[in-house]
Amino acid sequence: MDTKHQDKPSILMLPWLAHGHIAPHLELAKKLSQKNFHIYFCSTPNNLQSFGRNVEKNFSSSIQLIELQLPNTFPELPSQNQTTKNLPPHLIYTLVGAFEDAKPAFCNILETLKPTLVMYDLFQPWAAEAAYQYDIAAILFLPLSAVACSFLLHNIVNPSLKYPFFESDYQDRESKNINYFLHLTANGTLNKDRFLKAFELSCKFVFIKTSREIESKYLDYFPSLMGNEIIPVGPLIQEPTFKEDDTKIMDWLSQKEPRSVVYASFGSEYFPSKDEIHEIASGLLLSEVNFIWAFRLHPDEKMTIEEALPQGFAEEIERNNKGMIVQGWVPQAKILRHGSIGGFLSHCGWGSVVEGMVFGVPIIGVPMAYEQPSNAKVVVDNGMGMVVPRDKINQRLGGEEVARVIKHVVLQEEAKQIRRKANEISESMKKIGDAEMSVVVEKLLQLVKKSE
């Protein structure tokens, strides 16, 4: 391992092994590398292979990729499964445990590289423990929303009290979901203990991927939950890059009227059920808007796309040229910034919500799992979208409701006000982003000075 960058303070970054965590860590790494920090970016080999091309091409002198090998004591986790991507859900906590068991290998990396600071993620307080063994300061970075993180922490430290920003029935439902999550275990440790330790071990402050422009009330609630200062780092959006494969999509978009297309995507790690797929398809047709649908099926899924979609759906959209279905990866940031896009039908993963906000695209929320319902509240709080309501009894998604909300956000008179608000938020987030990053750099340099 190359350790020759002694003229700059160095940060070893260790994200959780999921796309939604690795990508924001990498964007933060790029920004810090431009502020005279040398970055060691540490992950499993297959994650580095997936994310590393852009780094090696454009940041090879300032961001160094460091492989962390997980122990081979987990036969169900071969190298291709040392990431959450395409990992069967029942193996997630096997992966959490295997990651923790890599602590000795991580200690060897620390001993060799001797970084100035360590930045770690919510799932691995053990990384902070390892850092302190070598007298290295460690900082928690949360690539999640402030609403999700504050609600999580509230349920750990104040479980019997009302969370001040949710209605009682909503809090009751989401608290049940989050308490189930908090009581899952890996290596005999409950999630709630793992997460609390992650907060407690962070040195002086905690970084979080958000902006005061959109989540000020949730950020201001943190001091009542923990001793550390919470510092927003801004949106951390990856700059769109051009690939030849994008041409077909961009050409199709360019044929459409301004703000006439809905972009539909439900993330890279959640896969809608066949029933949800049918209702989304029905809603898109009933809304009569143009649309691009980034369509993904789980790799273990036996169905084809044609079998997953309603009968005749693909033929109908091809005939009327209303829609395009794209399987697999799509240039999401590039699509969202295109002038033809008038709405974003999204699962409300935090990365997608922030991208929609930065590019000023109104959001039609279809939250499906995890913290997505809480993220959707940020969209509504800021007046830049709506959530598709589900059946109150069985939580089923309905195509008619999908169509109604799409029309409201994209086509009807109210859409003008939503678009105006989306544009205002976009401009404000861009303006405040540099100031927020300046605070991050200042805080890190304070830690560097103390470590000298």
From Swiss-Prot:
Q: Mind listing the UniProt keywords for this protein, alphabetically?
A: Coiled coil, Glycosyltransferase, Membrane, Transferase, Transmembrane, Transmembrane helix
**Where, by residue number, does an anthocyanidin bind?**
21
Single Gene Ontology BP term?
carbohydrate derivative biosynthetic process
Q: Where in the cell is it found?
A: Membrane
The UniProt entry's sequence similarity note says: Belongs to the UDP-glycosyltransferase family.
- Enumerate the active-site residues: 21, 121
Top-level taxon of the source organism? Eukaryota
Q: Which residues bind UDP-beta-L-rhamnose?
A: 268, 330, 347, 351-352, 355
GO cellular component: a single term = membrane
Q: Could you tell me what this protein is called?
A: Flavanone 7-O-glucoside 2''-O-beta-L-rhamnosyltransferase
Q: How does it sit in the membrane?
A: Single-pass membrane protein
The subunit structure is: Monomer.
Q: What class of enzyme is it?
A: transferase
- The UniProt transmembrane annotation reads 136-156
Q: What EC number(s) does the entry state?
A: 2.4.1.236
| UniProt tissue specificity | Expressed in young fruits and leaves.
Presence of the UniProt keyword Transmembrane in the record: yes
What is this protein's function per UniProt?
A: Involved in the production of the bitter neohesperidosides in citrus. Shows a strict specificity for UDP-rhamnose as donor.
